[in-house]
Amino acid sequence: MNDKYISAVHFVIDKCKDPYKLGSIKLNKILLFTDGILLMKTNKTLTGDTYIKKQRGPVPKNISAILNKLESENLISIRKGNDNTKLFFSLKEPYIS
């Protein structure tokens, strides 16, 4: 896990002002498309992660560890939504280098 990856996940969560519109699936897709665009333009990805095929789309292999790290550092809060989805709340501004 690199710091840019952790910061990017925190940044996306922070910029989504309505947590009910950003669940795990959308977060994963944002990361996938970001990696895809950067790969085409620079031949590198932001996350450096591999993606695992899941029923609802590709999932970054290390996303759970990233989210747990952000939550343990009190940078985000993760809660369950009404339909058993995950809701992400940013508790502090993300570090942008």
Regions found by a protein language model. Name each.
Residues 1-97:
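Domain-edge interaction signal
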